[in-house]
């Protein structure tokens, strides 16, 4: 098994491509060992000293480090991913769905804004999320209120130094161009 590794715009995060489907649908993010319990692979990765976050997409795993050098962490991470896929173990425990809306994470917007929200989500799904996934992350819609779009940033986007620029200059400009009601974009 050959696992490709790619740098991301976030220097604390690397993207690993195992050449196999990681999640058939949705995404999964764990920012601590407690959240990692939903996935045997995430638990393995959190068992490596220095790992502070994991994110799974359709065909990739991104790992965020709290400390340490990639030259020391990378071999252990590659070994854990390879061992996991070689054993055929499931990525998610007990067939648990990857994307779960946590309590308090429900989408919010005014009743009369449904058409605007549909357009915003369509733009995010077709123009933003594929590009962000290439960098090992994901951005999901959370809400729209008083001209402000609220987005959740995951994976390599979380804590990335360039994420504010991407959010403000890229995503905000795109949404404002196609949806005049949008005045601002903010991370949640």
Q: How should these model regions be labeled?
A:
Residues 1-188:
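Domain-level signature for proteins that mediate thiol-based redox and metal-cofactor handling
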């Amino acid at each position: 098994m050959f696992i490709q590794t790619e740098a991301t715009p976030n220097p604390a995060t690397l993207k690993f491509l195992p050449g196999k489907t990681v999640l058939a649908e949705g995404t999964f993010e764990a920012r601590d060992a407690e959240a990692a319990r939903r996935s045997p692979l995430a638990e393995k990765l959190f068992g490596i000293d220095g790992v502070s976050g994991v994110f799974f997409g359709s065909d990739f795993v991104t790992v965020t480090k709290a400390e340490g050098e990639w030259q020391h962490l990378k071999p252990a991470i590659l070994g854990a991913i390879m061992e996991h896929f070689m054993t055929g173990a499931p990525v998610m425990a007990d067939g648990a769905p990857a994307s779960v809306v946590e309590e308090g994470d429900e989408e919010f917007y005014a009743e009369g804004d449904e058409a605007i929200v549909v357009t915003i989500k369509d733009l995010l799904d077709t123009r933003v999320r594929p590009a962000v996934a290439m960098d090992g992350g994901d951005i999901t819609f959370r809400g729209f209120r008083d001209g402000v779009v609220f987005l959740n940033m995951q994976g390599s986007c979380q804590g990335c130094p360039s994420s504010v620029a991407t959010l403000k200059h890229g995503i905000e400009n795109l949404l404002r161009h196609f949806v005049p009601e949008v005045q601002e974009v903010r991370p949640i």
